[in-house]
């Protein structure tokens, strides 16, 4: 009898700090077999030389772990003359000249291949001064990037990031409809969708056919409008409604824990893993 297909639980080692072994060892302890690589050794993974990426891959291999995704910072950028606000890109420059961008795309895809990651996250240009904000739809670099990715056996997934130009459902659907046939999918951050007021059942059902990866983090809203991050399932993001809808559309999605909890990230990851295992229908591998 064939075993039923299940969704996958993923952990990002840099949630515990720059030493990737700490997060990898926690993944093993929690029974998590897949990793998301974003940064390591204090540097963005896309900027690391081949030998350091190979070392990270060997650390994962030694523990029986596979790299499910490279959480790259591609397109979380603007022109050099623009002035972005404070943006967390994990050591990657936010101001990137047009002539350097394809090189970064190619470098990220090579990094994914070295790590054994089948998926690479991208963004959609930072929102800066109106006259300098670039449009993602129609960006000539995107078809080039999709072609390079397809040749390399890697899939590009667009994250809905509020500081970027494509975060709401309408532009997301426009971009995905236009480029889905070329391989583009959705890296859905449910908390980001909730932040822009659109983590509803109707919106999730529209987006679900395009989803290839799910980011899971949670937060509590404070009276002053700020947010306090907390373990998944303990905040205001409506996972109890959203996760069953995503599972119904695709029963084998990867769910990646991204806590942003600074005081006790290991405890938050432990609690988040337990929450997802009890909430995603069909269980998690």
Model-derived features with residue positions:
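Histidine-acidic metal/acid-base catalytic patches
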Residues: 2-9, 17-33, 57-64, 78-79, ...
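Glycine-rich, proline-tolerant flexible connector loops at the mouths of alpha/beta enzymes
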Residues: 37-60, 125-130
């Amino acid at each position: 009898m064939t075993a039923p297909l299940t969704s996958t639980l993923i952990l990002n080692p840099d949630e515990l700090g720059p030493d990737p072994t700490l997060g990898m060892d926690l993944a093993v302890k929690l029974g998590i077999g897949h990793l998301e690589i974003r940064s390591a050794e204090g540097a963005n993974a896309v900027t690391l030389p081949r030998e350091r990426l190979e070392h990270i891959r060997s650390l994962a291999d030694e523990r029986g772990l596979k790299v499910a995704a490279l959480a790259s910072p591609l397109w979380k950028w603007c022109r050099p003359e623009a002035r972005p606000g404070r943006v967390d890109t994990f050591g990657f420059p936010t101001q990137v000249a047009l002539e350097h961008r394809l090189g970064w795309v190619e470098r990220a895809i090579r990094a994914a291949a070295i790590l054994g990651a089948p998926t690479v996250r991208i963004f959609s240009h930072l929102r800066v001064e109106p006259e300098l904000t670039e449009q993602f739809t129609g960006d000539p670099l995107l078809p080039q990037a999709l072609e390079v990715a397809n040749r390399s056996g890697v899939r590009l997934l667009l994250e809905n990031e509020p500081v970027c130009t494509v975060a709401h459902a309408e532009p997301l659907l426009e971009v995905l409809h236009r480029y889905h046939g070329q391989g583009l999918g959705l890296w859905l951050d449910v908390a980001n969708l909730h932040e822009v007021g659109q983590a509803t059942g109707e919106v999730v059902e529209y987006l679900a056919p395009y989803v290839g990866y799910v980011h899971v983090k949670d937060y509590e809203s404070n009276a002053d409008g700020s947010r306090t991050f907390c373990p998944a399932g303990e905040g205001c993001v409506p996972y109890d409604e959203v996760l069953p809808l995503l599972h119904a559309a695709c029963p084998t999605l990867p769910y990646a824990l991204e806590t942003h909890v600074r005081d006790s990230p290991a405890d938050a990851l432990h609690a988040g893993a337990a929450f997802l295992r009890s909430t995603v229908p069909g269980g998690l591998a």
